[in-house]
């Protein structure tokens, strides 16, 4: 190694699965590492990159970090592919079969992105479901760190999949959904079959989705280290189980508030770090400004969930009939097929005008922190769950698929900061749950949510567990320089 290279910063390659929630989490990690003066090459799909440039401040946000660079790559899907609903799973075989070979070629041709001012890749931080990135790292002798963008509880349940199959809990065929699952250590008293990750709801253990999940999760242990976007006070008992298999585990979350904390520590102006693939309609913030404190239920099912027209109408009637104010995010592509083009009943339109507001996409972090928000009807995606926890906002959980099923169980049964409405979509239940959250048990839920928000803030403040773990991660990466 030349003396010039000796003085160069560590160079980290970060590679997320190209869907919004994963890209968002790993962009925040990238910025946290930039603040520690590490060089970052961020692999991003061409589709994701174009959406980020069009709809967010990502260009100006990272312009202040000269050591950061995007490296676009194809995700193998046509631009008009929906990348939502069940079809979002198409991204896994596509990235493996198309992106994988392109990535390998890119790394070889670019000499691991080294230059006169940038050392070759020090380590690869890959999304935990991109095993081909791990294969390349092992082949080239590059240290590998996996970032799992899901909750610790979801990762651990997936890790225990061989035991779940052996015990007969998987595949879930529709019967016995409320039976307690005994083969996930640490969850033996409260985890039901219906709470297992959505990919477990298959008729055959050879189902490709199930096999991908099983394979990708178990291979995580080959990495030298792993990162989770969570914090010790939230998932400590489950983290203890994971550390038996992966002792070098860095919990650095909630990453969005951790980033804010670090920027404030360095007296850097905080830019709202949206990673949205859709244009945000900020008119909803003006509407919230005119509402009483803690009076509005925020409704958003994330970047992937799609609903049928029947489900849409049940939610809509439930919200209107509850008598509560609501702000509802309805993505343009969130209604299945042509269902969304049908006529909306007049009574729903009138009820919405009186107490509701609807937008195609919202600045969620800002909305959840608005004083008018009193509850969050959510799909229980992990980023949304953490954002709600940080904001001290109780939740009604209507999980759609994947890790969301188990997240919603923890929200209701373990953390007790909300209600679980999974596998139900009728207006009477929605009315009942909305009133329970926003009226009947409002003070109880707000008190618990406020306590959890304080724990989250402590974790990312100087001396907190996540703050210390990020410092430890940076030190570990620096130690990898040969």
UniProtKB/Swiss-Prot annotation:
Gene expressing this chain: UGT709C2
Superkingdom as given in the UniProt entry: Eukaryota
Protein name, as recorded: 7-deoxyloganetic acid glucosyltransferase
Keyword tags: Glycosyltransferase, Transferase
Tissue expression as described in the entry: Expressed in leaves, roots and stems. Lower levels of expression in flowers. Preferentially expressed in internal phloem parenchyma cells.
Family: Belongs to the UDP-glycosyltransferase family.
Key word Transferase present: yes
EC number: 2.4.1.323
Keyword ATP-binding: no
Residues at the catalytic site: 22 (proton acceptor), 127 (charge relay)
Known role: Iridoid glucosyltransferase acting exclusively on 7-deoxyloganetic acid. No activity with 7-deoxyloganetin. Catalyzes the fourth to last step in secologanin biosynthesis.
Alphabetized InterPro entries for the sequence: UDP_glucos_trans, UDP_glycos_trans_CS
Binding residues for an anthocyanidin: 22, 402
GO MF: 7-deoxyloganetic acid glucosyltransferase activity; quercetin 3-O-glucosyltransferase activity; quercetin 7-O-glucosyltransferase activity; UDP-glucosyltransferase activity
